[in-house]
């Protein structure tokens, strides 16, 4: 870092120390653009959802949903801007949670609308995609899922699978059913992500008795 003699003569030594400190901080700690927004569902977003996460006959109104954009880190420490559609009732909760996760550099690999995977939950989970709203039934039943209301979110699903007996979803996640093993993106009871969701009134599928859904938080 070069500082000209003219600056030294004009500012004096004390001012120069302040200037150098500020410049050094900006060089070492560049400001990262952060995004934590809640928006109504725009025409462009709604068009992406049509016939996919928002199929014909969906009884959840567009006005009940919100589009979120949030900054997050991946396991390599790279920053990304993710997107979610959720129920407006949990939008502020999710923004608070993801802002805290971002500050802590908690890793989330991918966060795209499930419509980018044709609303195919298996495809989305295989890609380790974090998602929220999708108008669909609970796996193996005709009962509407909390996802159908936008009141549930699946986080890092490849590494935090759904397991009921021999059934595992996504199908390529069987190795991650061993919760005693150590691997990236694993959600554990008591970790930061768990504590944040529980403190905002969510329940965790990893605590269920009849099955385990380690990726799943709902309200």
Give residue spans per PLM region.
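Sec/Tat signal peptide C-region and signal peptidase I cleavage site
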Residues: 29-33
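Catalytic cores and adjacent binding grooves of peptidoglycan-active enzymes
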Residues: 138-140, 144, 150-219
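Active-site acidic/histidine clusters and adjacent loop/turn architecture
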Residues: 60-125
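Bacterial N-terminal signal peptides
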Residues: 17-27
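N-terminal module-boundary/linker segments of secreted carbohydrate-active enzymes
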Residues: 34-78
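Structured segments of extracytoplasmic/periplasmic soluble domains
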Residues: 73, 93-107, 136, 158-161, ...
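Active-site-adjacent loop/helix surface patches within enzyme catalytic domains
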Residues: 112-147, 160-162
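Bacterial N-terminal signal peptides that target proteins for export
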Residues: 3-19
């Amino acid at each position: 870092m070069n500082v000209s003699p003219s600056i030294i003569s004009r500012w004096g030594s004390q001012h120069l120390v302040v200037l150098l400190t500020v410049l050094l901080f900006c060089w070492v700690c560049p400001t990262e653009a952060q995004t934590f927004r809640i928006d109504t569902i725009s025409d462009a977003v709604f068009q992406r959802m049509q016939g996919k996460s928002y199929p014909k006959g969906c009884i959840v109104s567009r006005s009940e949903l919100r589009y979120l954009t949030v900054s997050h880190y991946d396991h390599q420490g790279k920053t990304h801007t993710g997107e979610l559609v959720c129920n407006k009732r949990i939008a502020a909760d999710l923004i608070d949670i993801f802002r805290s996760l971002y500050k802590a550099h908690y890793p989330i690999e991918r966060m795209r609308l499930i419509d980018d995977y044709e609303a195919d939950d298996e495809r989305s989970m295989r890609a380790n995609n974090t998602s929220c709203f999708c108008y669909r039934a609970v796996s193996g039943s005709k009962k509407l899922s909390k996802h159908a209301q936008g009141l549930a979110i699946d986080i890092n699903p490849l590494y935090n699978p759904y397991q009921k007996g021999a059934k595992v979803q996504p199908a390529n996640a069987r190795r991650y059913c061993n919760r005693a093993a150590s691997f990236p993106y694993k959600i554990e009871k008591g970790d930061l992500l768990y504590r944040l969701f529980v403190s905002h009134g969510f329940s965790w599928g990893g605590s269920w008795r009849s099955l385990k859904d380690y990726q799943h938080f709902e309200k």
